[in-house]
């Protein structure tokens, strides 16, 4: 890929500004954890694995900002840093997974000097980024055999390199199939209201030379019924113990349409996206975002002033609509409750 989603550089965090794509490829530099939190909240960086990496790097930046003489004082302030980052996006479990991992690193080194702890936290954040890239490639390797020669794959939102440290989850599967020499095409839903499919997925695939056709969200059923789509692959922000999956709003509709038209619907996500503490998708918290995201498009009003708006950012697809969950450890099918537990060794 010819872009970097996020990286640690000279004790600063550098992110591609996804709100400026596809018009401008701009990289922002962040020197403090508060600005990283705002970048996550403002969707300058988005996608569950990517915001996990961003949160980890935010913790590492925050640790460098803390003024303390004792570990107890450092720990109290680090908890505040973590709390600020944790409040940015409530649905994506990778955010909380990364923050908890950083907390454990600090606690396990509490007997060391604070300089060592700060450097160890920086190293851990970089390690999380590097691991995510390897995980995405493994997801691609496991998922590519599910994409047959000549397939046309529908994807929703953006689960590509921009949503991860690189390569992608759903787009990682597509990339791996393409790299294996398969002649495939992609249909990308535009994904209202943020247009991640139009702005980001189409941009990524075109940069990689993978054939992509952009469609409006309400066209998916039409093309499925016509036989133009042969598989669906999406990412995930949180997966419950029974396989119910939270992903970008509109995913549930795509899954239902796929089932009706006998098209396999796959979820591609790292094991860190699993939340086995939740019995079902009914327990997944759903972020509700500002009304202006629906009433305005690129700053221009597209709805009457004062209209009532609902804007959930995610929906939950019941496991019965999912043909398989593709992870870095393999593909899970069927009895998700049993197989997901086995996957993580529970």
UniProtKB/Swiss-Prot annotation:
The active site is at 237 (proton donor). It is an enzyme of class 5 (isomerase). The gene is mtnA. The lineage of its organism: Bacteria, Pseudomonadati, Thermodesulfobacteriota, Desulfuromonadia, Geobacterales. Transmembrane segments: none annotated. Pathway: Amino-acid biosynthesis; L-methionine biosynthesis via salvage pathway; L-methionine from S-methyl-5-thio-alpha-D-ribose 1-phosphate: step 1/6. One of its GO terms (biological process) is L-methionine salvage from methylthioadenosine. Its EC number is 5.3.1.23. GO terms for molecular function: S-methyl-5-thioribose-1-phosphate isomerase activity. Keywords: Amino-acid biosynthesis, Isomerase, Methionine biosynthesis. InterPro entries: IF-2B-related, IF-M1Pi, IF_2B-like_C, Initiation_fac_2B_a/b/d, M1Pi_N, NagB/RpiA_transferase-like. The record marks 157 as: Transition state stabilizer. It catalyses: 5-(methylsulfanyl)-alpha-D-ribose 1-phosphate = 5-(methylsulfanyl)-D-ribulose 1-phosphate. Belongs to the eIF-2B alpha/beta/delta subunits family. MtnA subfamily. It comes from the Bacteria. Catalyzes the interconversion of methylthioribose-1-phosphate (MTR-1-P) into methylthioribulose-1-phosphate (MTRu-1-P). Substrate binds at residues 46-48, 89, 196, 247-248. This is Methylthioribose-1-phosphate isomerase.
């Amino acid at each position: 890929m010819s872009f970097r989603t996020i990286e640690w550089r000279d004790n600063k965090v550098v992110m591609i500004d996804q709100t400026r794509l596809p018009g401008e490829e701009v990289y922002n530099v962040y020197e403090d954890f508060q600005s990283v939190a705002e970048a996550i909240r403002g969707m300058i960086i988005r996608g569950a694995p990517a915001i996990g990496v961003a949160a980890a790097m935010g913790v590492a930046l925050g640790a460098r900002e803390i003024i303390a003489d004792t570990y107890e004082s450092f720990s109290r302030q680090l908890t505040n840093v973590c709390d600020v980052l944790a409040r940015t996006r409530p649905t994506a479990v990778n955010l909380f997974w990364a923050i908890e991992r950083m907390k454990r690193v600090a606690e396990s080194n509490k007997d060391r000097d604070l300089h060592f702890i700060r450097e160890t936290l920086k190293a851990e954040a970089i390690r999380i980024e590097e691991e995510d890239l390897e995980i995405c490639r493994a997801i691609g390797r496991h998922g590519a055999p599910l994409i047959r020669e000549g397939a046309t794959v529908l994807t929703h939102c953006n689960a590509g390199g921009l949503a991860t440290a690189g390569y992608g989850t759903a787009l990682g599967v597509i990339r791996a199939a393409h790299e294996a020499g398969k002649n495939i095409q992609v249909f990308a839903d535009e994904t209202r209201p943020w247009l991640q499919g139009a702005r980001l997925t189409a941009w990524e695939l075109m940069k990689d030379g993978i054939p992509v056709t952009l469609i409006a969200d309400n066209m998916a059923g039409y093309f499925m019924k016509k036989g133009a789509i042969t598989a669906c692959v999406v990412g995930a922000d949180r997966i419950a113990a029974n396989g119910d999956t939270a992903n970008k709003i509109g995913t549930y509709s795509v899954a239902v349409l796929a089932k009706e038209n006998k098209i396999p619907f796959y979820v591609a996500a790292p094991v860190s996206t699993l939340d086995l503490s939740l019995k079902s998708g009914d327990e997944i918290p759903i972020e509700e975002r500002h009304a202006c995201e629906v009433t305005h498009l690129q700053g221009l009003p597209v709805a009457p002033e004062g209209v009532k708006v609902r804007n959930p950012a995610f929906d939950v697809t019941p496991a019965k609509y999912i043909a398989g969950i593709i992870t870095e450890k393999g593909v899970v099918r069927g009895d998700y409750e049993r197989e997901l537990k086995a996957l993580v060794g529970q």
